[in-house]
Every structure is written in structure tokens, then in C-alpha cells.
Amino acid sequence: MGIVVQKFGGTSVANEESRARLVAKVIEARHDGKDVVVVVSAMGRKPAPYATDTLLDLVGSVCLTAPPRERDAIAACGETISTVVVAAALEAAGCPAVSLTGGQAGISTDSNYTDARITKIEPRRILEVLSDGKVAVVAGFQGVTERGDVTTLGRGGSDTTAAALGATLGAEIVEIYTDVEGVMTADPRVVPEARFQDTMSYTDLIEMANQGAKVVHLRAVEIAMHSRIPLAIKSTFSDSPGTLVADVAPRAVATFAPPRVVSAVTTVAERTQLVLQGDLYSDTGSVLGVFSTLADQRISVDMINVFPDRIAFIVASREAAAAVETLKELGIDAETNPGCAKVSVVGEGMRGVPGVMARVARALHDAAVRVLQTSDSHYSISCLVPESDMERAARALHAQFELGK
């Protein structure tokens, strides 16, 4: 029998009603003749008692500077609890299941606590469970080091667990179940005209994740792409087929229409622009020093523009004060421009196509949106705009590239 990996997020395991829907999805796959590996996240979101942030607060209330190793040890408890609850729910429905922690499932990681990388997976225990005719319910988001210490994989780590298990087990597909019915052309809270996409490429989903879309974790999509494992993004709460992510999006009928240049618009709010004045460009060491020092402080930098007389980039607004202080220690004064947002158009189809930037500029100009900064790659164009203009900018770009049709 083929193997299917099904990952269920926090809202899918949060209460009895959602867990009943989860159980139905698993039983349906088994009725289709599949061996099923279930990956689960912690139950619900803060202030739910077993949500990751709630558990971390237990440590934070005792020691604000708790070592990362200890934070990982308690953060991983949420997923471990979920595995037992879900396995019990499956058993109660007549579907035999075994709960496994990340370590029991054979997931090994490096020692980068709170943001560990999977180094290898030994799936022997999972395969034993499947060969016994049972469902393996695996804790997402966690693994163990060579010394046996528990680690976590960073936010979105359960997606990574599911993709890595799918690749290791040679799964037919990895199904990511969430509270939305698939990948949309934009955040519907920002662009009401956004629509669901039936199919899309790995490249487009990776670029969406790079530009801030919180659909599937970036590492998970990269693993799936490199392993050529299809991903299906579905809702636990509906029977919609969701969005299929694969090498070549299959179509029910032949089509001779040109591919879309842009497949989605993404938005990221609460950004602060930092501008460093001076002739830093002539001193490569100074430029490298700025960004390496910020990286050492774990401050993420985006939209970097280097000019002869200045450097401009953005950081999350919550990290702006720390970034300014770090730069002061280097003897560099930073001009800050808070209250910004990044709006991006994403699409594998734009590579090598002339005029995309012109269309972006025209749409934003016509919408009276002030552009503070731009950056681009082969598959995306990003514009920094005042946060107050973010929705207007996103809607203008969505309309410009006819993504609602």
C-alpha cells in the first residue's frame, strides 16, 4: 500500500469537534487503501493550556533568560500531548493508532535549539507501526540531538516534519490540513477578491513563503520540491480538494492560454525601514560588517538596497530598536522610517518577461500609493509602502494582474 502523510495544525486538534473531522480524514485515507502517518501540532493557540506559547510562558514566568535547551524541552510538550490525544481519538473510532514523539519516530537534528535542522530520519519504528496495520501519529515540530536532548524546529516546524517524513518514507503525497481551503491569490482579509488556486508550482509557493505568506513553512516546500513529493493544502473543515502543489500542475483539459505572469500578491505589515547614510559602499568590509553583526544578533534583514551614498533595508518593527542599538555599537547612525509594509507580486511566469515592473509601478501610481523602496528576484517584485497604503496597494496589484478571474 502507498503511504500518505497527513499533517494537522493546531486548530485541527484543538477540540473534540475538530478532532472528529481529523479522524474522518484519516479513516477515509485508510479506506482508500493507504498507510497513514499523521503529524500533529500543539492544540490550539494561546491562551489554550497546551499551546506552544502558553507552555513557554510557564518557563518565562520563572526565568526570563531560560536556556534555549530548557525552552525547547517544554515547547515540545504541546505536540507530544497532541499525539496521545489524537491516537486515543483514532482508537475510539476503531482505527488502531500509536503515538510517537519526534525522537521515537527517529527524527535526529542538530543542536541549534529553538530552530533546529533535521539531519536524518531513521523510520524503523514508523514502518513497524504501519506494518502492524496501525496509524503512526507523530509529534511535529520536534526531534532529538545525538545526545538525546529534545529540540524544536522553529515556527512552522510541523510542516517541515511532515515533508521530511514524506520524503524519507517515499510517500505518495503530503497533505497539509489547516483552517483554510487552500492557497489563495492574496490574503482575503486584505484583498476581498482573492480566490483559491487549484494548482500551483513549488517555485511559486516557495516564493510566496519567502515574501511572507504564512501558508506552508518554507523548509517544508523546499523538502517536497527536492524530493518531488506532491503537497496538498486542504481544510480539515471541508471536503474541498484544496490546492495541489507539484512540479507540473495537472489540468483536466488541454489549454492554450499563456501562463499567468503573476500568481499571487503577498503582504507583510509592521516593517521599519532603516537608512544608513555615508560612503559605506566603498568599504566592502563595512557593508559586510553591518549585515554580519545584525545576523549575529538574530535580526532578520530584508529588501537590501546598496547605493554609493547610503544603504537601505527593512526589519520587523519589533526588532527595529535592537537593530538601531546594534548599529550604534558599530559607530553607525540609522535613520528609521517606521510604519511600513511590504507588498509583493509573485510568479514563476514573470521570469524573463519584460514590463512586469512597469505594470506594478503603473498600478501603484494610479492607486496613489507612495513607493519607498523596491527589490526583485527572478520570481517576485516587492515594494515598500506606508502601512496605511498596504491594502490599497495589494488590491491595485491584484486587479492589475487579474488574479480575481
Predicted regions mapped to residue ranges:
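Phosphate/diphosphate-binding glycine-rich loops and adjacent basic-rich segments that engage nucleotide
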Residues: 139, 192-197, 207-268
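Electropositive, surface-exposed helix/loop patches at the edges of structured domains
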Residues: 130-145, 208-232, 277-278, 284, ...
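A conserved regulatory-domain signal marking ACT and ACT-like small-molecule sensing domains
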Residues: 242-405
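Terminal amphipathic helices with adjacent charged low-complexity linkers/tails
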Residues: 41-56, 233-252, 308
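Nucleotide/pyrophosphate-binding catalytic subdomain
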Residues: 1-221, 384-386, 401
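Glycine-rich beta-alpha junction loops
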Residues: 43-44, 180-182, 227-231, 235-240, ...
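Short hydrophobic alpha-helical runs that function as membrane-insertion/retention elements
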Residues: 173-177, 231-233, 302
